[in-house]
């Protein structure tokens, strides 16, 4: 049980160190919603989400009051729409996107994920319908998020899927030019996408999941930073141990809220995602944790080692606190959402290549990176391919959320607002990868995929 000292410690984490529940995400299976009529299908989708989703925001508010911990977002993730869209046209598939937007507005969630396609080994008609309509849907809605899984360790890398994704990103940026390409902040390209991820924009509800599931994401970079700052003379073993103990405490909060939310909604509890998720708020930064360990700036030599230690310690502590750990679970390094990352880019300590190296040891990948709007599609495809290959060879989730900002060049600033923050536009390698990426086809699965 909790003692009085632990209660006071938790209150301090909330009041002074930005500890919060980043998201309570309700996963909803839409597999039973398909009808021969698109109108009926859309109505079925809205009714299925409404059945439990109408109580989600209210439940989050009640838990905030009961436990005194901020719950920042209530969200919904649905079955990948490509699994529903095979019997429809592209025009009809767009209507599914509109239906998701309408129900998200009705129940009051700020994002709904799952306008997604799983194309790691090839394309179905439903996949093509979704991929061709992502730019339009994201430009014409505010809350719908999309994701594309282009590779797995077992299947290899679908290079045609990567090229398709790069074109989608470029078109989405153009369609949302008046918002500096903001639509691209709602697209994630994955390797080894998890089916129970509570975080946007990459959340979708996997086919192996129950009808309804609650998954929770906790955010505590500020708490971890304070712990690191308290022991400046500690060696790395002691430092890792203190981070581990802190992650244990953070995760207990997440599991408590998640199980209570599931009980109140009358659904199954899924997982706690352990990921340290930064925000643009002062002191709520993963980069600042790394700098508190002794690096002048995030990106300096030693950054990847520090991030590896941080991620591993968080996982060990979190796994001790909850048996139901899943999603992405590690540390996020979204550039625009982390003030420390933005500062590191500004001074030249951090570039895309260093971020790519860091993704080999952390939770996700190249996240919320703004690049010049004139960047060729082939270069975007090459960047995605590099990142995806790290995930495939290491058997882990990696992803790319990249924003080619129309009309802007490297060194200029872009403001996305809210949790998406602001950032400086990063330079990209000027040499061409077009001949390589245009070969297309599939990169075979690595030898470590043969595990049976």
UniProtKB/Swiss-Prot annotation:
Pfam families: DUF711. Gene3D superfamilies: 3.20.70.20. SUPFAM superfamilies: PFL-like glycyl radical enzymes. It comes from the Bacteria. Homodimer. Belongs to the UPF0210 family. This is UPF0210 protein CHY_1509. It comes from Carboxydothermus hydrogenoformans (strain ATCC BAA-161 / DSM 6008 / Z-2901).
């Amino acid at each position: 049980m909790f003692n009085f000292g632990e209660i006071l410690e938790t209150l301090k984490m909330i009041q002074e160190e930005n500890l919060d529940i980043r998201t309570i995400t309700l996963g909803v299976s839409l597999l039973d919603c398909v009808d021969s009529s698109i109108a009926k299908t859309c109505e079925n989708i809205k009714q299925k989400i409404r059945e439990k989703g109408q109580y989600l925001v209210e439940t989050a508010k009640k838990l905030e009051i009961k436990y005194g911990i901020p719950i920042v977002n209530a969200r919904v993730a649905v079955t990948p729409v490509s699994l529903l869209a095979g019997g429809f046209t592209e025009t009809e598939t767009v209507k599914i996107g509109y239906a998701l937007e309408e129900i998200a507005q009705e129940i009051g969630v700020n994002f709904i994920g799952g306008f997604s396609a799983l194309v790691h080994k090839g394309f179905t008609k439903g996949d093509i319908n979704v991929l061709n309509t992502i730019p339009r849907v994201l430009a014409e809605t505010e809350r719908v998020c999309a994701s594309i899984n282009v590779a797995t360790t077992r299947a290899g890398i679908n290079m045609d899927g990567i090229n398709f994704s790069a074109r989608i990103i470029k078109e989405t940026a153009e369609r949302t030019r008046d918002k500096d390409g903001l639509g691209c902040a709602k697209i994630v390209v994955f390797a080894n996408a998890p089916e129970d991820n509570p975080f946007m924009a990459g959340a979708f509800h996997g086919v192996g999941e129950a009808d309804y599931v609650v998954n929770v994401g906790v955010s505590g970079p500020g708490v971890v930073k304070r712990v690191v700052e308290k022991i400046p003379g500690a060696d790395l073993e002691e430092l890792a141990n203190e981070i581990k103990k802190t992650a244990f405490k953070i995760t207990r909060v997440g599991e408590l809220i998640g199980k209570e939310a599931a009980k109140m909604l009358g659904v199954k509890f899924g997982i706690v995602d352990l990921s340290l998720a930064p925000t643009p708020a002062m002191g709520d930064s993963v980069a600042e944790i790394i700098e508190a360990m002794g690096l002048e700036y995030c990106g300096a030599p030693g950054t990847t080692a520090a991030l590896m230690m941080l991620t591993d310690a968080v996982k060990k502590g979190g796994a001790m606190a909850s048996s139901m750990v899943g999603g992405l679970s590690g540390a996020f390094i979204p550039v625009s959402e982390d003030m420390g990352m933005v500062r590191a880019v500004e001074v030249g300590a951090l570039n895309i290549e260093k971020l790519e190296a860091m993704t080999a040891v952390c939770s996700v990948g190249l996240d919320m990176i703004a690049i010049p709007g004139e960047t060729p599609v082939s270069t975007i495809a090459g960047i995605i391919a590099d990142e995806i290959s790290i995930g495939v060879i290491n058997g882990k989730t990696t992803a790319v959320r990249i924003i080619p900002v129309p009309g802007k060049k490297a060194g200029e600033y872009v403001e996305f607002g809210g949790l998406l923050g602001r950032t400086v536009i990063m330079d990209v390698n000027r040499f061409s990868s077009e001949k390589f990426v245009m070969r297309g086809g599939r990169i075979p699965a690595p030898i470590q995929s043969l595990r049976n």
